[in-house]
């Protein structure tokens, strides 16, 4: 199991250390993944500290149950198999109404990318799937083969920011009229054929942005992150902290917006006095995002686009 779920944790110390861990605190790893952040965070907790780990991928939880066994044996870890958009209600089931810190490592994990049959990668031939939760109903196959032209253009442009969204959607529409598009390599080839030759000379795979867009749509990644981060801000105790690692501009813009909204007074400008209930709930720990070190970038190519934003709760 361990070898099957190899994952190099990004911004490990930065994301956890910035939570300013209290040994007896209650913490949440909203994106368990390869359990690297969880393992480090647990090493900083005392016997009374507790960590709640969310993941919708059963394989991630199975792997973590091996990796974190010493802490499980001490009763310091609780696994919750669910989408983190249900953060508040699932924690409430465990009697938790307030937390000292929470960490998000957004996006798809390395094992999910590397596992061919999950259909996340444009580099390997596999059925079109892209579900983070293998029990979920919507797959990439449904998106590609049943969404109408306008819906395809919308998600390609909104979530992939690809300027050739219309041309790609048209190619897909033409191809699926003959037979369903069923594999990742079929889709990648169609995307490539829709782009002009000069575009194909640019760095990066021509299908990258469209695969990202479909993955975000299948898993409602931005909707889930938006809902979950807002719940997390409410759940934080005074002086509690939230760390969010993002890997593309859409996630980062969302996080930046939510943090800015919560760190701005909800009162008209020019008021001589701001009532406590209108004061900001958050304070930014770092104005600019924290980036991986040069050493980390050399060791892990997937860290290149990572950004970390951290905020602290200053008002309940």
From Swiss-Prot:
Keywords: Cytoplasm, Methyltransferase, rRNA processing, S-adenosyl-L-methionine, Transferase
Localization (cell): Cytoplasm
Cited HAMAP family: 16SrRNA_methyltr_H
Record-linked SUPFAM superfamilies: Putative methyltransferase TM0872, insert domain, S-adenosyl-L-methionine-dependent methyltransferases
Domain of life: Bacteria
Binding site for S-adenosyl-L-methionine: 35-37, 55, 84, 105, 112
Entry similarity comment: Belongs to the methyltransferase superfamily. RsmH family.
GO biological process: rRNA base methylation
InterPro entries linked to this entry: RsmH, SAM-dep_MeTrfase_MraW_recog, SAM-dependent_MTases_sf
Protein name as it appears in the record: Ribosomal RNA small subunit methyltransferase H
Listed NCBIfam families: 16S rRNA (cytosine(1402)-N(4))-methyltransferase RsmH
GO cellular component: cytoplasm
Reactions catalysed: cytidine(1402) in 16S rRNA + S-adenosyl-L-methionine = N(4)-methylcytidine(1402) in 16S rRNA + S-adenosyl-L-homocysteine + H(+)
Function text: Specifically methylates the N4 position of cytidine in position 1402 (C1402) of 16S rRNA.
EC code: 2.1.1.199
GO MF annotation terms: rRNA (cytosine-N4-)-methyltransferase activity
One of the Pfam families matching this protein, by short name: Methyltransf_5
């Amino acid at each position: 199991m361990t070898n099957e779920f190899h994952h190099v944790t990004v911004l490990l110390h930065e994301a956890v250390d910035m939570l300013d861990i209290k040994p007896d605190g209650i913490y949440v790893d909203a994106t368990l993944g390869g359990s690297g952040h969880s393992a480090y965070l647990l090493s900083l907790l005392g016997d009374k500290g507790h960590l709640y780990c969310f993941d919708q991928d059963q394989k991630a939880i199975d792997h973590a149950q091996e990796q974190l066994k010493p802490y499980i044996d001490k009763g310091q870890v609780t696994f919750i198999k669910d989408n983190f958009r249900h953060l508040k209600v699932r924690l409430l089931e465990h009697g938790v109404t307030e937390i000292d810190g929470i960490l998000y490592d957004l996006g798809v994990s390395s094992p999910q990318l590397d596992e061919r049959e999950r259909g996340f990668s444009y580099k390997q031939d596999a059925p079109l799937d892209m579900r983070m939760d293998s029990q979920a109903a919507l797959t990439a196959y449904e998106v590609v083969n049943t969404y109408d032209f306008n819906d395809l253009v919308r998600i390609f442009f909104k979530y992939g920011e690809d300027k050739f969204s219309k041309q790609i959607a048209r190619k897909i529409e033409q191809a699926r009229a003959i037979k369903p598009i069923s594999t990742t390599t079929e889709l990648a080839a169609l995307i490539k054929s829709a782009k002009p030759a000069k575009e194909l000379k640019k760095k990066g795979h021509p299908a990258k942005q469209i695969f990202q867009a479909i993955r975000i749509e299948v898993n409602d990644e931005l909707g889930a992150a938006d809902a979950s981060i807002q719940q997390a801000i409410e759940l934080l105790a005074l002086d509690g902290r939230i760390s969010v690692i993002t890997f593309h501009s859409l996630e980062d813009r969302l996080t930046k917006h939510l943090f800015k909204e919560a760190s701005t007074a909800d009162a008209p400008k020019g008021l001589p006095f701001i009532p406590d209930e209108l004061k900001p709930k958050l304070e930014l720990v770092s104005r600019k995002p924290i980036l991986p070190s040069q050493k980390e970038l050399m060791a892990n190519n997937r860290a290149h686009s990572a950004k970390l934003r951290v905020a602290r709760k200053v008002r309940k």
